[in-house]
Amino acid sequence: MSEYLLATHGLTKQFGHHKAVDHVDLHVKKGSIYGFIGRNGAGKTTFLKMISGLSQPTSGEIEMLGYKNAQLKNVRSRISCLIESPGLYGNMSAYDNLAVKCRLFGINDKRYIENILKTVGLSN
């Protein structure tokens, strides 16, 4: 297993002719904390979406916890990223917002969602 928690090699995301992320190589050692700072449109959110499995790269490789590219679904439940916009739907309850996010990761267990809400004091 690699000494790195996360490694990207030539990671690229292209929308039409625009490269939002262009051949990024990154190696994050276990126990490290990183932040991404840059102007609007620099590709920060696009990069985070790719490494968290919410978007597929146009090219390049992602390795996390020993899993690569298509195998990353095996670690999705163990990773998270905090993006400055909250990504919540104002017209939905806390339960419904959480259920939407859980479905993105293949989690459809009502008890799981209820336990999370109870943990943070939002049950009922």
List where the protein language model places each region.
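Short hydrophobic beta-strand immediately N-terminal to the Walker A/P-loop
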Residues: 34-36, 48
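Helix-to-loop junction immediately C-terminal to a conserved catalytic motif
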Residues: 52
